Amino acid sequence: LYLISILLKMDSAAKLQLMIETMLQDPNTTKETRDYIQEILKTIRDQSQPKPKWFAYLDVNYMQTDNSNIDGVSKTGTLYARDNVSEFPGLKYDKTYSRGASITVGKNLSSSSAISFNGALSVNTQNKGEENESDLASGSVSYSKIVGKHFLLPYIFYSRPNQRLSADLKTKGVGFNNTYNINQNNSVSYSSSYSKSSYNRSAANAASNVDDANNEIYSANIGYNYSFSDVNLISSKISYTEKKAKKNYNAYTGPSFNIGYTRILPFGTLKLDKTFETNTYEEKDTFVHSTISREDDIETSQIQLSGRITQLIPFIKKFDLEGKIFYNFKYTEIDSDSSLLQNSSMRKNTSFNLIKRFSLYE
C-alpha cells in the first residue's frame, strides 16, 4: 500500500494529508473509499521501500448521535396536506446508535496503482422512536492510480438498508474522482457520480406506492484547494445535482457551493465546513399543495475533529501501542427553508465515533 509514494516525494507528509482531506470531504466518496484512502496514507508513512503486496484489515466501530429534530418537524410545527394546514406530528430530540464492522482486502498492483474490495454491515437503533432503526449492508470496489500529478480514483458501490418500519431500498452507483497538483500549494479536484435507488414494494406497503420515490441521481463538482504553512488547507467547490424520479414531484435539480478550512493539530485534524444548496422540484405534489411549487434552500454547517485516540489522550498509548483506535467528533447543523411548510426545518446533530482497526494481513 504505497499508492501515493510519488506524491510524498514531491511534498511533505502534512501537505499530502491536506490534499487527501479534500477527497475525504467529498460527499460523493463512499465511507469505504474514505477508509481505504486513510489506510494508504498510514502505510506510506510506515514503508520506506515499499513492495507490491496484498493487504487486509478489519474495522469495528461504534457511533452515538444526539439529534435535536430527528423527524424533521417543521419550524412552524405545521404542514400542508391537500392545500390545508395541519399539525406536524413527530419526535424531536432523540439519540441513535450505530454498531458495525467492515473488512477491506486489496492489493498494490504497481508502484502507482492499487485496488481494494470492501464489505460492511452496521446495525442502527434509536432510543425513543423506531423510524430510524435499520441494518445496512454495503460494499464497494475502488481502484487508485497516479499519472503524473493526477491522483485518479474510480469506484463502484452498493448498499441495502433494511428498514424496520419503512420500505427497504437498494442503491448502486459508480463514481470518479481526480485531484491534480498544480504546484506545491495549489490543486484542483473534480468528480462525478451516478446512483440508482429502488424501493421494495411488498405486500405490506403496496398501498403507499413507495416505488414512486425510485430515483437516479447524477452529480458533478469541481473544486480548488490552497494549502499553506504545511498544516492548513482552504478548499472550495461548486457542484450540480440532478435527481430523476418515477414521479416528478420527487425529482429536482440544483447547484451547491461549499467552502471549508482544514488544519492539522497535534491532537487531530480539525475541519470547518459550510455548504449552500438550492433544489428546485420539477412538479407540484398535489397531495401536499396544488398551487405551490417546491423549492428548498439548505445551509449545512459542520465542525469535525478526528484522529487517533492516542493524539487526544496520550496515556492510552499503553493500551493502543500501534495507534489503531480512531475517534471522530462531528457537529452538524442543517437549516432548511422551503416554499412548503413541512420542508422548512432546523436540525442539529452531534455525534461521536470510535473505530478499532485490526490488521489481518500486511
Region roles according to the model:
Residues 2-362:
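Gram-negative and organellar
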